[in-house]
């Protein structure tokens, strides 16, 4: 039977990696870690106008139900252990979106003694969303970039 015959009969061929990654991109459940004004834009992205639900993004209240963490705002030294603890409670595979200049590199408060100069010093970050504060459209674009990154990742060989 040739490939034309298989496709004519209604069969679809793919790899396990592509199938698993396709399902993961359609069901991202973020844990919101809103620390400052960027959290307002994150809530705006989840509201009716931008509706992240249409991308399969459903905000979850517990880290044990989440696979994405959105760090939105200024991360202080006092909150860094809590951020790491919440990240460690999330199930594998897990991804992190750093939202806003403060979460990316300290932002306006970069030279303050109490600010962590980027949440990537505490947890590994997959997508950076720039801006002060970034718009809801920027967060939606960041989610789309994360979905593209998940599609490119080898699921079975991932450690």
Curated annotation (Swiss-Prot):
Coiled coil: none annotated. [4Fe-4S] cluster binds at residues 37-38, 102, 132. Its cofactor is [4Fe-4S] cluster. Transmembrane segments: none annotated. It is found in: Cell inner membrane. NDH-1 is composed of 14 different subunits. Subunits NuoB, C, D, E, F, and G constitute the peripheral sector of the complex. NDH-1 shuttles electrons from NADH, via FMN and iron-sulfur (Fe-S) centers, to quinones in the respiratory chain. Couples the redox reaction to proton translocation (for every two electrons transferred, four hydrogen ions are translocated across the cytoplasmic membrane), and thus conserves the redox energy in a proton gradient. This is NADH-quinone oxidoreductase subunit B 1. It comes from Burkholderia mallei (strain ATCC 23344).
